[in-house]
A protein has these predicted regions:
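Hydrophobic alpha-helical transmembrane segments of integral membrane proteins
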Residues: 1, 52, 74, 79-81, ...
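N-terminal signal-anchor transmembrane alpha helix
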Residues: 1-16
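Alpha-helical transmembrane segments of multi-pass membrane proteins
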Residues: 5-9, 86-94
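Interfacial helix-loop-helix junctions of multi-pass membrane proteins
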Residues: 16-26, 95-116
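Perimembrane loop-to-helix junctions flanking transmembrane segments
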Residues: 23-40
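Membrane-interface loop-to-helix entry segments
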Residues: 38-61, 114-133
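Cytoplasmic juxtamembrane regions at transmembrane-helix boundaries
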Residues: 61-86, 141
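Cytosolic juxtamembrane helix at the C-terminal end of the final transmembrane segment
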Residues: 134-141
């Protein structure tokens, strides 16, 4: 699951923060309307990316250690399933904590403010669907 959490964070940070530029880490608190706010948000985007990198490195370390055990069983379905669960869990936790509880940012801040909630709900549905799909894939292995 750690791989999925890390990859979910990378997807969010790279695609939503950098490529599409829909939001930044603190863009609801500090809107991107000045160079100072952009620098602050970019810094916290980097902190966020560093955290996701730690998840991926931790997953790689655990996988490496486990793979060296003689009783370790390789299963593509289980691996893909746990990655989907982790990715989906990232979306659910980030969607609830960052978007709703703390209000740090919302999924798509480039649309009218009245539409932000729809994007946030879609993000949560996407996360729940990945968890469910991952669970089904993992059970069949």
């Amino acid at each position: 699951m750690l791989f999925g959490v890390g990859l979910g964070g990378f997807f969010d940070g790279i695609v939503l923060h950098q490529i599409l530029q829909w939001h930044h880490m603190l863009s609801s608190w500090y809107p991107i309307n000045s160079m100072e706010n952009l620098e602050l948000n970019t810094f916290w985007d980097g902190v966020f990316h560093s955290a996701t990198y730690i998840f991926v490195l931790s997953a790689l370390f655990i996988l490496w250690r486990s793979a060296r055990l003689s009783h370790f069983k390789w299963s593509t379905r289980e691996f893909a399933g746990t990655m989907l669960i982790g990715f989906g869990m990232f979306n659910l936790v980030e969607g609830v904590v960052d978007h709703q509880v703390l209000g740090l940012h919302h999924v798509n801040e480039t649309v009218e403010r009245s539409s932000w909630m729809f994007w946030d709900i879609g993000f949560l549905i996407w996360g729940a669907a990945m968890v469910a799909l991952g669970w089904v894939a993992g059970r069949r292995s």
